[in-house]
Amino acid sequence: VYVDLVKDRYPGKALYQTPMTKEVARCQLALDLAREGKTVCLVCSGDSGIYGMAALVYELRGENSEPEVEVVPGLTAACSGGAVLGAPLTHDFAVISLSDRLTPWETIENRLRCAAEGNFAIAIYNPASHGRPDHLKRACDILLRVLPEERLCGIVRNIGREGQSSRILTLGELQAADVDMFCTVFVGNSSTKVVNGALITPRGYRNV
């Protein structure tokens, strides 16, 4: 899907796609093509250094100095989605993915619990997919052991794309929300509030 979003900008260029779970093959292909003297761009969503392919490229290249690798910073969903809702991440926050394909669910549970106990605002990536439709509900069950049902949250879908939508709701409502892999979920901290329709987490400036 990421190549489909950009292919019209680069007419005449060779495009290569690999399916999900083939990330190693995708990165290795990029390195092999670069070693042939080609200029290669490995396309990721958001920022390639945040749940992207940047680290994997460095791992596969190993201690070799060739080919040269340049990581171009992008705009991750925590930032772009937060801007759609307002400013929910203005203070300390955690970013947690609910995908257990590469991370054990027990580790994800622990990270959710620690973030809630630390009163962090939380940006949640990969809240659901066809293979794990109940992961957000399970995550909410964990958060609700620490946080109140009325804790403010937000959902943004298709950030920056056609059909973008957003919603502000409570943690209790989030538990039953309809989400998919195109959604990013935000859970506020104890100071998060709604001001004129915007979800914000104050930094703590005095006299405001």
Give residue ranges: language-model regions:
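General beta-strand structural signal in soluble alpha/beta enzymes
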Residues: Q17, L42-C44, V69-G74, L89-H91, ...
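Glycine-/small-residue-rich active-site loops that bind phosphorylated ligands and cofactors
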Residues: K22, S48-G49, D100-T103, A128-G131
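Class I S-adenosyl-L-methionine
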Residues: V1-V69, S80, Q175
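A generic local secondary-structure boundary/capping motif
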Residues: L31, V69, V84-L85, E109-R113, ...
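Class I SAM-dependent methyltransferase SAM-binding "motif I" and its flanking Rossmann-like core
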Residues: I50-G118
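A contiguous loop/helix-start segment that scaffolds small-molecule binding in enzyme catalytic cores
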Residues: T39-V40, E117-V208
